[in-house]
Amino acid sequence: MRYRLAGNKPKVMVVYGTRPEAVKLAPVILEIQQDPRFDSVVVSTGQHVQMLQLFNESFNIRPNYDLGLMRRGQSLNSLFSNAVSGLDPIIESEQPDVIMSQGDTTTALAAAIAGFHRGIKIVHLEAGLRTGDLASPFPEEGNRLLIDRVSNLMLVPTEKAKSNLLKENTDRNRIVVTGNTVIDTLLKVSESPVIFNDRRLQGLVESQTKIVLVTSHRRENLSKMREIGSAIVELAEVFSDFAFVLPLHANPAVRDAMAPLVGSADNILVTDPLPYRQFTQLLKNSYIVMTDSGGIQEEAPTFGKPVLVLRESTERSEAIDAGVARIAGTEKESIVGSVSSLLCNASEYAAMANSVSPFGDGRASIRSVAAIADLTGVGQRLPDFIFRP
């Protein structure tokens, strides 16, 4: 176990590897870098290198280290092993007091385990999410259980996440309800107008075409891509006055599975991954969202966009309870039925669009840094975030 010398600033190492991690860590990184009580070091594993480059450029975040671990077709075990091996010498050299990771990715788990093995305090941002099913999502449910187990401080987005941890006999003094930092990021980037690189998207937004935004990338959904793709094609035929926009994930397995299924319809628009600010603008201008992304389940309700979840379960049950999201499943019939019901029923749509997001107030990063200050002995925690419908 490391002990900080009197007078030295605590050093916080922040590790991320995918764009969703970076989106949620960005406001925390910026808060830490602007706080004179801390030193910081930022490490990217490059798990999703192309999407991360777009994000880092948008937020002017320059990692101190980039492991560049992205390899086509590598196994989870290979990625995990390479991440731990790459992080360990950096940890030894930098000697951080705290290692912070976010969510449930292979990178997040590798950072937590590498730090735990070095006796360093672990902070888990977005702790406490659970489906109760290790196979869904896979491997994320197992990853987050392991990360929380070795964490000294768990920054949870909601009371439900806190309750999940308390049911696992977690010390309540190690839990802080912050709200979700994705709301901090979303509110910041949506303040200014954005011009799309893709003129087709710019045209859709300017013409006020009703947009159905579709994203699907989860590992457990790869075998369901034909069902999801077929559902999108049928919906596009029935709702011909809507534009179905699919920014395809950079993962070749996702692109290879989905692109051939949806490429023929005139009102289906397939794009490359979008820079985060452009994606946020597209989300803001969408009518509904179909997604298996956890982050988008949190982001869309901030703009009053109903979410249909392309999964059989979700760890973000707060969205279901608040009425801002519904489970559409992964079977064609279920997806078509769920989307059709929402698009054909104005009162049903209004009820979802007018519900209040349970995920935050834009101050989650401030609460997070205050909690880290408390953990390292240079400050005090702030009161927990409380959702008021």
Pin down the residues of each PLM region:
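Nucleotide-activated sugar donor-binding and catalytic core shared by glycosyltransferases
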Residues: 1-246, 251-389
